[in-house]
Structure formats: structure tokens, C-alpha cells
């Protein structure tokens, strides 16, 4: 896939469509490569040491998508781009805080070790080690506090978006942030079920925007 992106041509229908989209909206090849390279690195078990490593990962899997969307939306002001990066980081942090157990089952720990009160490992989390799970949950709360800072920064850039898409992006961001808020209120049930924001809560949040 990487070679085909660099060539700008592919026999695969999906990749070919993506390359057409890239040409139509003048999406930089570097963004596609950053995205693909991060997915390649993520094929293998991993654990992140610190927040900087997490931000780099989040950039690769999420911020790159936001930057590509800027091109699709016709956002040309370079001042908007850092806000798109921040929103991608924030949303990925929300995902990570929600999916610790699911990720551990896939031999991945994305909550940085620097945010964990005590060390954790995938086996301990999956097997229900109480000390490790308590540590991971506290790490998730610390991560969500950082995510909120990124959401706040991203919100400063909504004005760069065309009116036709601005509200949709604001809704998506708010609903993702609400995942973290639900995680923070779900200590007793966090490990029993995946955190989900109810339809009623989503509707309320949307009406508040």
C-alpha cells in the first residue's frame, strides 16, 4: 500500500479510490504515508512510555485524518491545522481511555506508563488483577484530563471550518469527550462493560451546543 501511495496508482479498487480522492482535494502524500506508517507500526504488541509517544501515535492514526478532512472541507488557512491536530489527539485519547481492556486483549497498552501509579501488563489486565486494573483506571483518568486540554484547544479552531460542516464537527467532538466523562463516572462498572453514551445523553449534549 505504501509503495502504491508513493506511485500514485494502484490496481486495488479501494486504494485507487483513495488516490483519486487525494488528487481531487490535493491531500499531501505525506499525510497518507504518516497514517499508513502508524498503522504498520501498530501491527505488533506495544506499550507506550510517556505522553509524547502517545501524542505521536494519536497524530498518526487520528490527527492525519483530521488534516485530510481539512482539505476535503476546503479549509486552506494554515492557522487551522494545529487545531485539527489537537482534535485528533483528543478523540484518540478518549478512545484509549475507554478501550483499555479491549486493547490489552490485543496485547496493547496505550495509556502511557508515565501516567500509571503502578506498572501494568496485558495479562494482568485481562485476568482481572485488581491492583493493575486500579492503576490502569487511574491512568485513564489522568489521560482524560489531558484530553480535555486538547479538546479545549481544538474548540478554538472551529471558526476556521466552513459553516456547512462546523456543527457536525462540534457534535462529533462533544460526543467523543462525553465518552471520557462517562468513563470518569463509571469506576465500579468500567471493567464489566464497554463505556457507552446513551442516545438520550447524546441528544441532550447536541441540544446544548
List the model feature ranges, each with a label.
Residues 1-91, 97, 101-209:
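Catalytic cores of Mg2+-dependent Asp-rich isoprenoid enzymes
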